[in-house]
Each structure stands twice: as C-alpha cells, then as structure tokens.
C-alpha cells in the first residue's frame, strides 16, 4: 500500500475528511444518482487468519488430501495469496495470517478457495465468497464455513477489521461504479553497474507494477557510449492495489534448437532482482533512483510519479448525454406539430406535454432489415414518423437504421429511394464478396486494425462482409458522423444495440445491454459512457491512455448483427425452445451458507455468503464444448480499472438478489475484466426493449415491430420477465391461445399496475388481410395481384431464412409491401395509442405538478 503517498497527496489537495457515505436501501425504480459525485471514504486494515479445515476429502482415492487455501481480494491486492500445503491430512491446520488494506467505497468480497494439490496440478474442492461488509469494525470475528453438510467438512477463518491510520481518500462515484485517482509512473533507464555483456547474449531489464494496466516491460541495457535516446517505461495503476515497482535483470541467450529447421529458441536467465517502494517517491518530481539487484549489481533509473485525480474521460451517471438532451429539446417541437396534425388538436402541445414514442425493430438478418424499411414507409405515409422520438433496433434492423442515417435528412424525404437502393443490393449476387480483390481488401483492413492494437476476430471479418452486402463498396462512415442527422431534431434519435456476454454463458443467463448512439457508447447498467469517438480507445480507471481511431461503422454493423456468435447450447435453445438439459449435471452447485438469524446479516447491500462446489475438470471440459461461443467481438473495456460501489446491488439493473446470478459475483463483473465481448443483442432479447425502458428516456408509447418467423410474442414475454426481475414498469402481456396459434396484425398492451408503464403496440410479421387486399379497404382483383399477396412467410422453404442474404426482387418487394400494409391497415389503432399516450403523459405531468 502507498502508506506515505496517500497522506501527502491528500494534504496537497487539502481534501476534507468527510467520512464514509452510507447509502440507504431504496426501491429499484431507477438509478441511484443521475450524476457522479466526489465522495470521501475511509480505509480499513483487514487481518485474515486461516485457521484449519476439518474432514476434508481429497480427489485422490489412495491418499488423503494435500490441502492449501488460496485467498483472493482483487479490490485490495493484484494477485492471490495462499497458505502452505499440508500434505496427506484430512484435518489440515495452517494458522497463517494475511493482511489487506481495503477501501470503504467499494464492494470487497473475499474469495477463499480450498485446493487439493497433486502431481499434475491442483484440484479445486470448494470456493467461498464472503462479503466483508458482514464484519464489524473493532470486533474479532471467528467464522466457521460449512463446506459439505453431509460429512461435516468445514473451514475456520478468523477476521479482524480495524480503522486504518491512513487518511480517508476521495473517489468519483455514481453509486454503482467507483473511480479512484490513477497513479502514473514514468521512468528512464539511465545506466547500470552490472558486469559487461556476454559474448553470446544481451542483458535487459524487466519492469513490472502488479495490477498496472501495462504488462511487464522489457528494456534493453545499452552501454553509456551507445547513441540514441535511453529506454523509457510507463505504468498506470490503482494506488490502492500496488505499492512497488519490481525490477529483474535478465540475460537473453540464443540456443540452437535441434532438428532440421535449426530455428533459434530464446532462453532467459534471471541474474538479479530488486524494487522500489512507490510511496518513497515524491509526487510530481523527477527522482534519480539506484536499484540494487543483488551480488553487487545495480541499475540507475530516473522516475517521476504523478497522481491523476481530475475529471474522467468517461461519463459516470445515469442521466442522458448532453447531445441527447439537446436533441430532445429540438425534437419535441417536431413531434408537437406532427401530433397536432395527426390527432387534430386545436393547438400545438407545449414541450412538457409531448409524449415520447419509440419505434423498435427486432432482429432477423436481411428479413428484419427489409421489413423495417416497409414499416417506416408506412409510418411516413400516415404522417406518424415525425411523432417518433427514438428509433432502435437489434441485429438486422440496425443495418436498415444505420443505412438510412447516411442521409442527414432521410425522414424528411420519401423512403421509396432508400428502399429501391436496398433492393438493388439485397437482390444482387453476393459472389463478389469473395473475389480476389475483396479478399485482398479484407486482409489489408484487418491488418490495419490489428496493428492499431485491436484484437481481430471473425466478427471483424463479418463486418467487412456486411459492408459489401449492404453497399458493395467501401463505406468510410463512422457512427459519430450521424450527429449531423440529429443535431436539429430532424430525425428520430438512433439507438443501436449489442450485449456484453461471457464466452461460456448463454445470453439468457447473462447479457449486459450496451447502447451505441451518435454521441455516446455505454452501459446503462453501470452508468458508464464514453464519447462515440473514443469507443475502441484504451481507457483505464476512467482515464484515456491510448487514443485509437474511431472504428468505421461496418465493424459495428458486424457486431450488432453477429447472430453466429453463438454456442451449441444456445443453438438448441433457439431452435428447440430449451437448452441442453443434461448440462445441468455437469455444472457445479451454489449454496448459501449464511446464518440469516444474525442481525448484522440483514444489511440489504450485503451479499450473502455462497459456497461453490465444482464438479471437476472433466465436467468443465464438457461444459466448455457446449457453452463456449464460436466467436465474439473483443473490444477494449472502457470500464476496466473501475470498482463496484459497496451498494451496487441496489442498482436498478442488477439482479444480485438471485444468489446464483453473475450479478452476485462482483469480482467477475465487467469492470474487473480486460475486454468486452460484444455480440448481437438478440442473444438476450430479440428487440431493444431494455434500452427504450430506461427511466431517463421516459418513453410513453413503444411501437414494437417483430420480424421473427416464429413465436410472435416471445420478445414481449421475455421483456416482461426482464422487467419483473428489475422492478421496471411494463404492461401485462396477456395473449389468448387463438392468437398464439395465428397472430393478428397488431396488438395493444396498455394494462399495467404502475401508471409509469409504457403502452406497447406490437406488430408481428404476419400475412393476414394483405393476402386479399391491395391496400386497406381495397381488395385484390387481378390474378397477378392475388398471386403477389398469396404467400406464406414461415413455410419450410421460406426465402426469408436467417442465413439467406439474397432475395429475388418479388420476395423483397413482397416483404416491404407487407410490412408497410400492416402499418397502414392499423392506422386507427395507432392513433388511439397515440391519444392514450398523450392523455397518460399529461395526467402524469399534472400529478407531478
């Protein structure tokens, strides 16, 4: 710990020691804080003494267990610690003590893992997760953790928590995430007092700061007479985690590898090691340091340590971005005039009276893209497109939306032009995507992306293929370019979607919605957003470390529509309606070990103690085969280095009350991970309801266009469950068996217990009256007209399958015409929903006043 550094830094800044801010239990009705705050919290000294375990059964049938305990507290230490190994013993006793310094602002969960050491490695017997908020300051706490009730296996640990002498420190927090000040260490290698270099080798220094953003860095040792600039190094680290710069002197040798290839294999030998206590260095001043490496060897470094405690380069908060708020002010004027005309109002509405309407397009590849063109055309013909504030989509719908927004005035001109251009690309051959010229283009573009530091995946290649499918030429556009299309409020505000997933969990088990807009990219769950121009750049602890060019939109289109980034389990889930049930036998168990009768355990922000018992390496191998994703888009994690707030479980988007949900495992959540794994939002819910339902957007009416071939109400049912888990107002979805058998063109859902619930107008993709009507009220007459309308969308040999990207012209126009017609044919229901949304909005305004 930076024992001396923190008091000096705090003294320089003259921070008031305000003490810890305790957040009270609240209803899960919205974000805790709309904006970030600076808060001051104390430090605590934690002593963990691992005493003993009893009745432990190992994995070796011929001998007793060789036990040791690993302790991991990632909010206080960059690496795990462990006890010694007690060999061949069922009742091992350690009596080993470990010391930590923890910060009062963050959620500190200690992981205690019991291992059985064997020749080839270590077998995990059990894992305990213990929320340190269970401890009372100043009171020793001896805890016996049950590991197996059947044979009385137990682990005994003693905790002592004391108020630290280190002064309290200030953090930036939004009530879910916490940003500590960032420590930057910069240095230059000035020379060394080591022996001369060997004839067949070269010496280099390896420098590392545990927990730093940067990996260990190798610096070549050069003679003082050698020209050129001296080698430099830089590290960024959370000062709560690291206190020391480690220096190792390495000798690099070259050995000839035996075999016909005669390749050279690099070998290194450690000649010495040393380190520098970072707290011994003055802040903001360059310091000359000499590091002893042992046996008379030393190296000279010039170092400067600085603390970054100013504003962040990302936004922590649950309010809308400035760009979106400015858009809303302008868009309300457009919507007000449109509503006056559509509903026949005597005068235009005041800005506070204008209801918020969102159009949501589901996933479905080319089918969804083509259908959304038709739905939007229908809204435009009815004069309803200007009543829409938000336009959002999943997967294929995002392809339609992102193409439209190439024109900053797209909604103000007839959509026939964009539809005709889309038809040209959808109905043309895609063989050119695999031409020699295009393959060279893909190789070149992916090479540029990889050299810029990005982790290139199959989804990046898919993005280049999507670029060809949509435009058949290079598209230089970036998402931030679309700011021009919303600056005056002339179009609805576009919200593109993806979900951050785990590589070995289904989207239904864990998916964090990530929104992409012209102004910001971010996670509403965490209240963390970066400017769109910075997506893909490297941030750590909320600070920009490495600026990268904003990715072209084709890479985002590939991510938004990456339906193939799935696992075998998810394939069965989507095709058969249920996952692979036999996998449950291979999963480990999770049990609650709390004694809920103890009064200190009733803190609503405290996570209950959980015991995880794995099934073994073979079971894990089986799970990996069936649950691992084929691919995902790996992006720099802009939340990396941030910590979870001590009361994060009160956040609206967290379901940590489900003890087995990943939200209840804070050490594994996104801020603790190096990369984001972003995939098609359809893996969670095949329509972007969660982003439209954010309380800060206050959507009154949702026009839901579902372009799936089957289960026309699945997205509504899944959204209903999603909202129920999180306490989000949503109407009751009640559908009769006859509608499940054969859906109608439009459904209005407005019944809800909570008056803040939005109205949902749902349009399944069905061919009902379009089959017999050329237009609303106009029946088909000629054989040609009847043949055009007489088709089954979801027949076994449907041309609208997910993996079909090329349509015949008639199939394309049928789909667009059907989607357009279903909107036009329900104009009265649309007007009724708008009027109801207006009435509810005004009623809420009056109640609020």
From Swiss-Prot:
Ca(2+) 1 binds at residues 60, 66, 116, 118. It is found in: Cytoplasm, Cytosol; Cell membrane; Mitochondrion. GO terms for molecular function: calcium ion binding; calcium-dependent phospholipase A2 activity; calcium-dependent phospholipid binding; lysophospholipase activity; phospholipase A1 activity. The gene is PLA2G4F. Keywords: Calcium, Cell membrane, Cytoplasm, Hydrolase, Lipid degradation, Lipid metabolism, Membrane, Metal-binding, Mitochondrion, Phospholipid degradation, Phospholipid metabolism. It is a peripheral membrane protein. InterPro entries: Acyl_Trfase/lysoPLipase, C2_cPLA2, C2_dom, C2_domain_sf, cPLA2_C2, LysoPLipase_cat_dom. Has calcium-dependent phospholipase and lysophospholipase activities with a potential role in membrane lipid remodeling and biosynthesis of lipid mediators. Preferentially hydrolyzes the ester bond of the fatty acyl group attached at sn-2 position of phospholipids (phospholipase A2 activity). Selectively hydrolyzes sn-2 arachidonoyl group from membrane phospholipids, providing the precursor for eicosanoid biosynthesis. It catalyses: a 1,2-diacyl-sn-glycero-3-phosphocholine + H2O = a 1-acyl-sn-glycero-3-phosphocholine + a fatty acid + H(+); a 1-O-alkyl-2-acyl-sn-glycero-3-phosphocholine + H2O = a 1-O-alkyl-sn-glycero-3-phosphocholine + a fatty acid + H(+); 1-hexadecanoyl-2-(9Z-octadecenoyl)-sn-glycero-3-phosphocholine + H2O = 2-(9Z-octadecenoyl)-sn-glycero-3-phosphocholine + hexadecanoate + H(+); 1-hexadecanoyl-2-(9Z,12Z-octadecadienoyl)-sn-glycero-3-phosphocholine + H2O = (9Z,12Z)-octadecadienoate + 1-hexadecanoyl-sn-glycero-3-phosphocholine + H(+). Ca(2+) 2 binds at residues 60, 116, 118, 123. CDD domains: C2_cPLA2 (cd04036), cPLA2_Grp-IVB-IVD-IVE-IVF (cd07201). Expressed in myocardium (at protein level). Residues 306-849 form the PLA2c domain. It is an enzyme of class 3 (hydrolase). Its cofactor is Ca(2+). This is Cytosolic phospholipase A2 zeta. One of its GO terms (biological process) is glycerophospholipid catabolic process. It comes from Homo sapiens. The N-terminal C2 domain associates with lipid membranes upon calcium binding. It modulates enzyme activity by presenting the active site to its substrate in response to elevations of cytosolic Ca(2+). GO terms for cellular component: cytosol; mitochondrion; ruffle membrane; vesicle. Its EC number is 3.1.1.4. Stimulated by cytosolic Ca(2+). Residues 27-145 form the C2 domain. The active site is at 395 (nucleophile), 680 (proton acceptor). The keyword Nucleotide-binding does not apply.
